[in-house]
Amino acid sequence: MTLDNLLGRGLEKAAADREELARYFERIGRKLADSRQGSISLDSRFDLAFEALLQIALAALRANGYRTTSAAGHQRLALQALPKSLGLDAERVRALEEFRKKRSAGLYLAAFEPSAAEVEALVRAVERLQKDLAAWLKAKRPDLAPKAGK
């Protein structure tokens, strides 16, 4: 499967520029910083870390010339596209998908209360993915990589 195969099925073509990717990195950084604040509830910290994860997945799609539509399932699609958009292996994507499922259970069913360990695991996974995105941009799309110091 390629990203082109998903055109019309949740993805559409959309060019990105360096400023847009810089904004993604700024948002990701803020959400990660907030997710580490011990004064915030665990479920809010989990949500913030998940939002950072989603921003990375969306930024990776944008760097490849795509974006999700607003159709149902767009968050899942963005995460499941990570092997093609960022070169992630299937095992890491499955782990990220588990975080998405937990967040959905909490958001839509009030059936998930994250532990401190689960929040920390998600934050670590997102920090790693943020580094992966930066390295991918530097190697594959230096024209979109945020300038040093940003």
Name the predicted role of every residue range.
Residues 1-150:
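Terminal alpha-helical segments
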